[in-house]
Design a protein with these regions (language model features):
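Conserved ABC ATPase "signature" region
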Residues: 128, 132-135, 140-158
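ABC transporter nucleotide-binding domain
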Residues: 204-288
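Catalytic Walker B motif of ABC-type/P-loop ATPase nucleotide-binding domains
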Residues: 187-191, 196
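Walker A (P-loop) phosphate-binding loop of ABC-type ATPase nucleotide-binding domains
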Residues: 67-71
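Conserved ABC transporter NBD signature motif
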Residues: 88-99, 103-104
């Protein structure tokens, strides 16, 4: 049986990929356990997007941080088999990605950064289409799975409405739902909480927390608190290079004894230092400054957050 699948996105548009499900039917029940990235590189003409990157991750939620242009999306597109690396390889349970493309595609849930839908379809119609393309041929089972993921993302009461009537946040939740359809063992989320309000962002965190024991989840986001609350391990990329791998606590330690809280009385007090955060308490403004030594006699050292550790790391390598 050959099915034409056009649910994968490339350059913000849909394109068709042909999967031969008969070739991987038995393997579709296999679970991806380990992903190893070995000396991965990719160039767009003369621009190096990834430069000799190596790391590994397994079941659980693995965080991917980095500023714009760091190479995060390029890596995720390579892992999703949408892009071939210029050098190096990715091993899926010890086997080269280039030889496992069909298996990966039948076991992946992918939410790209720029997710598009068919606006004339309802959420149920769109997800039914995706489910069929992912090989769910039993109509009853398909409907049950669709309603399950719609409840997970809190769209079940809007399931019969056309997607064109949805807000941007609701469309993003449709994107999360389509990634979850088919019970994939590898999930790739590129900026999944963009456009979500705080309640829905918390709901997303709960979703991936529930499934993280069974699946490999790669989470890339600029919302550092999402990484802090969901991940144990992470990697930081900058200008295509790996600049950090370790635990969330390890990255926090980069800023240990380097973040100071001072009351803001004049702008000159903070002008010579990197300001990580401004907060208000009892009508008084306080600044969190990054400094290797105590900047003022009245400065107080505070415990760093992940965002503080991340900013301190980027400042070190600037």
């Amino acid at each position: 049986m050959v099915l034409e699948l056009d649910f994968i996105f490339h350059k913000d548009k849909l394109f068709t990929v042909t999967f031969r499900y008969n070739n991987c039917k038995k393997r579709s029940q296999e679970v991806i356990k380990m992903i190893e990235v070995r000396n991965l590189g990719h160039k767009y003409n003369s621009f190096t997007a990834l430069d000799n990157v190596s790391f590994s991750f397994s079941k659980g939620v693995f965080g991917l941080l980095g500023p714009n242009g760091a190479g995060k999306t390029t890596f995720m597109r390579i892992l999703a088999t949408l892009l071939s690396p210029t050098s190096g390889d990715i091993l899926i349970d010890g086997k080269p990605l280039s030889k496992e493309a069909t298996f990966i595609r039948s076991n992946i849930g992918y939410l790209p950064q720029h997710f598009h839908v068919y606006p004339q379809l309802t959420a149920i119609e769109f997800l039914d289409y995706i489910a069929v393309m992912k090989g769910l041929t039993n109509k009853k089972i398909r409907h049950e799975k669709i309603m399950h993921v719609l409840k997970e993302v809190n769209l079940h009461q809007k399931a019969q409405e056309k997607i064109k009537t949805y807000s941007n946040g609701m469309k993003q939740r449709v994107g999360i739902a389509q990634a979850l359809i088919g019970n994939p063992s590898l999930l790739i989320f590129d900026e999944p909480t963009v456009g979500l309000d705080p309640e829905e962002r918390l709901r997303f965190r709960n979703i991936i927390s529930k499934i993280s024991d069974e699946k490999c989840v790669l989470l890339s986001t600029h919302v550092v608190t999402d990484i802090e609350s969901s991940c144990r391990d992470l990697i930081v990329l900058n200008k295509g290079k790996k600049v950090f791998t370790g635990t969330v606590e390890d990255l926090k330690e980069v800023a240990r004894c380097r973040v100071w809280e001072v009351p803001v009385r004049t702008t000159s007090e903070t002008s010579d230092y990197i300001v990580l955060q401004i907060k208000e308490s009892n009508g008084q403004l306080f600044a969190h400054l990054l400094a290797d030594e105590k900047p003022y006699p009245y400065a107080k050292a505070i415990d760093p957050t992940l965002e503080m550790g991340y900013m301190a790391l980027l400042e070190e390598i600037r």
